[in-house]
Amino acid sequence: IFGYPIAYAISRVREDIRNGVLLLIMLPFWTSFLLRVYAWMGILSTTGLVNTWLQNWGIIDGPLELFYNQFSLILVMVYAYLPFMILPLYTQLLKLDHRLLEAAGDLGASPIKSFLTITLPLSKVGMIAGSMLVFIPCVGEYVIPELVGGPENLMIGKVLWQAFFDQNNWPLASAVAVIMVLLLVVPIAIFHHYESREIEGEKA
């Protein structure tokens, strides 16, 4: 939802602005993943930056519960993995032949119709690649649910960890591991299918 509009906007701006935005997107990769998660803990806690700012401005009387809930889990997951969606999409959109859009405009197609019939289908491989890069690590994610999500917000990676190391429940852990593998095989097969079709199309 967020990755496509951002990638599309980056691909349409001037090159100097584009390079600056890409640098900002890549900047978090130069710092520790764990440090970035801990930074969000400081921002969202009851004494963190958001609550302090809202209380100082008189918007709220007491601190909001922004931490250890589904909101904080989704927010930090999106922050952590959004670049993995943006970069493949940006690369695919940058390769788009804009003469196709000009031709569609000359033939009377509106910008929305040109986007839906040309830009969106031609960026399908980038969407699939980005979805793969996000989905695979998210399935096994343990750090963010453990540090940010709290005990009530479970993900497969956290369930697997608890079954193995906390409960010593090897049958349950093995079953969860098999489910995780099956969840990963399907999108990998889909991505391989579309990638093979694109390679064949380029050769043709």
Spans of model-derived segments:
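Membrane-embedded alpha-helices of multi-pass transport/permease systems
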Residues: 1-6, 21, 34-38, 47, ...
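Transmembrane-helix boundary motif in ABC transporter permease subunits
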Residues: 1-26, 98-101, 115, 119, ...
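Membrane-helix interface segments
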Residues: 13-21, 50, 69, 99, ...
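Transmembrane alpha-helices
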Residues: 27, 79, 84-98, 109-140
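Membrane-interfacial helix termini and adjacent extracytoplasmic/periplasmic loops
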Residues: 37-78, 112, 148-152
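Glycine-rich helix-loop "coupling/hinge" segments at transmembrane-helix boundaries
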Residues: 42, 142-168, 204
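Hydrophobic alpha-helical transmembrane segments of polytopic membrane proteins
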Residues: 73-76, 132, 154-191
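C-terminal transmembrane helix and the adjacent membrane-cytosol boundary/short C-terminal tail
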Residues: 90-105, 172-204
